Amino acid sequence: MSRLQTRFAELKQADRAALVTFVTAGDPDYETSLAILKGLPEAGADVIELGMPFTDPMADGPAIQLANIRALGAGQNLVKTLRMVRAFREGDRTTPLVLMGYFNPIHYYGVERFIAEAREAGVDGLIVVDLPPEHNEDLCDPAQAAGLDFIRLTTPTTDDKRLPRVLAGSSGFVYYVSVAGVTGAHAASLEHVEQAVARLRRHTDLPLCIGFGIRSPEHAGSVARLAEGVVVGSALVDRIAKAGSKEQAVGDVLGLCRELAEGVRRARR
């Protein structure tokens, strides 16, 4: 089994949801970002999404857009992001790590080269938000052939006619964007999320992870009762933006991660 399959199987056995945390690689700089990345599993992150900085992150809200600007300004690029994954894997062979971002930097880097180096570095899966299933041959198919999961996003506007096409070829888990719009937007109602989860379960057996707008342990816990995973990104990235020092950024992000993890763990007790 893949690391993602193993992790979700373990959590199903334990009857709890996964805490999926998102941070942008290189934010606010390489060393601080690496310290955060290395600390996330011990702070309670079950799965990590690591953002690949890009100059035009159109699906992201202000917090993550600024994180991209900070990271790029500090010199982060795809080579350094893969180096960061290798450094993380030196001390952690079990926590699933998914790279999330946009196709342009991957295309520029070279798809074949990117897939080979991502696999070698210890990446488990990819989320590429601007690559629809009509372009599976561009990245999804070769990535899966190399052993990388390809995780699709679904939204409230993905209708039943479109949904099977979106889910075809998906692996690892399904990321449900609970509100239409950019990351960090207002949260969807739990009733809406519950209805969406029921609809998705009619189309897939993959674990469902819910994201966008989740900021507090209480909210994370509420969502954890409905799905296999809870994704938190903007709330963590905000802690980096507001920190007065690099040391505080590490401490604040990991502190919030611990609080969120406790909220998720309490959800089904």
From Swiss-Prot:
Its EC number is 4.2.1.20. It catalyses: (1S,2R)-1-C-(indol-3-yl)glycerol 3-phosphate + L-serine = D-glyceraldehyde 3-phosphate + L-tryptophan + H2O. One of its GO terms (molecular function) is tryptophan synthase activity. GO terms for cellular component: cytosol. The active site is at E49 (proton acceptor), D60 (proton acceptor). Pathway: Amino-acid biosynthesis; L-tryptophan biosynthesis; L-tryptophan from chorismate: step 5/5. InterPro entries: Aldolase_TIM (IPR013785), RibuloseP-bd_barrel (IPR011060), Trp_synthase_alpha_AS (IPR018204), Trp_synthase_suA (IPR002028). It comes from the Bacteria. It holds the Pfam family Trp_syntA. Keywords: Amino-acid biosynthesis, Aromatic amino acid biosynthesis, Lyase, Tryptophan biosynthesis. The alpha subunit is responsible for the aldol cleavage of indoleglycerol phosphate to indole and glyceraldehyde 3-phosphate. PANTHER family: TRYPTOPHAN SYNTHASE ALPHA CHAIN, CHLOROPLASTIC, TRYPTOPHAN SYNTHASE, ALPHA CHAIN. Tetramer of two alpha and two beta chains. Belongs to the TrpA family. NCBIfam families: trpA. This is Tryptophan synthase alpha chain.
